[in-house]
Amino acid sequence: MSPRPPKTRVKLDPLDLAGIDDMLSAEEKAVRAAVRQVCASSIDPYVAEWFESGDLPGVRDLAKELGKLGLLGMHLEGYGCAGMSAVDYGLACLELEASDSGIRSLVSVQGSLAMFAIWEHGTPEQKQEWLPPMATGEAIGCFGLTEPDHGSDPANMRTKARRDGDGDTADWILNGSKMWITNGSVADVAVIWAQTEDGIRGFVVPTDTPGFSARLIKHKMSLRASVTSELVLDGVRLPNDAVFPEVRGLVGPLSCLNEAR
């Protein structure tokens, strides 16, 4: 009977049991290191206080800092976006998540929902107006799909948009509400999905439009270092060029959710 070979011990890194580091390029590791550094300097020292207070003071300054690093819409091409890979984006989100899920939510909702919706479905004018300032953090966006009564059933959303007049160039009037909207109370622009006679349509809504309001949701059990809001649209009048021109139906919002996830 031949002797058993000696056992070899494999030294495992408890922080990298799957050996992911060996699969990353030098550039990808550099992206991760840069995000880790900004988390250590600008998020980690304050996140416990933010969690306790249930607030994110200085969110605009933080957004600008993240924008300087290229983290806002970082996987999109053009319009001032970094055009990085999905791996880069995933590594950045992992580092942000390690600091706090609320901060990761700020970045992913800005880039993968609000910015992606405009980038994918918007007109050239909508893209040029909003994407460059959103990429730098000068403008913050939110994504209005979930509703108080239809969070997981967007096909039955109650928010309505109707034409005010005849013809294809008439203004739109929006009425309804959205709930649990990340960035809502600090957003400069909201992507709002609403029922129309032609199915669900998407609208680019500047948040200073009369009839638009946002209420901060407090006393949350989780994502406390995140701005979460209820949006109310009370007779919000928008010009025809505020609508996404081509996309209709659930394919619009669901394409954005697929991108974000």
Question: Where in this protein do the model-derived segments appear?
Answer:
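A short, Trp-centered hydrophobic/proline-enriched beta-strand micro-motif
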Residues: 137-145
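A structural signal for short hydrophobic beta-strand segments in well-ordered beta-sheet cores
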Residues: 159-163
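Glycine-rich beta->alpha junctions and the first turn(s) of the following alpha-helix
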Residues: 20-24, 31, 213-261
